[in-house]
Amino acid sequence: MLRSSIIYILSITFVVAEGFIFNDESDAQGVTFVHDHGGTDQRYYIETIGAGVCLIDYDNDNDLDIYFCQGSPLPRWDKDVILENKLFRNDNGQWKDATSLAGVGDRSYSMGCACGDVDNDGDVDLYVTNYGQDVFYRNDGDGTFTDVSKEVGANNPLWGASSAFF
């Protein structure tokens, strides 16, 4: 009886799953981020680890924006490119790169991020963990951030892999 129930559930799952088709709409909607892990042939441990993403309403317009963590050049890296974390502003389902305007284009080897209103001013702040110095961005409430890492004592010069606000 148990075996026939499991087979029945699995067949329903396959029948239902056949109707789903996923299309990559990221380019059409303006999300053009591609993560680069450093790409050396040295097989550094850090190259095997992915990076974080934050869903953050940084501009208080009641829709979620996206902050992507990016890799960074490692020793013996032969690419001639500048990598930085990216912030994409959600504008009714169309995404605009707001990294430069917001001032959150950290160029360290970022691993993770967390967002929360740390200073209770109604604006969501952003913490980025890095292979190297972590960064804390205070949201200024006008679409921009200020790096206040030193002022708040965010002193982790080694390797921060993840973070969370409670």
Language model features with spans:
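Acidic, glycine/proline-rich Ca2+-coordinating loop motifs
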Residues: V16-F166
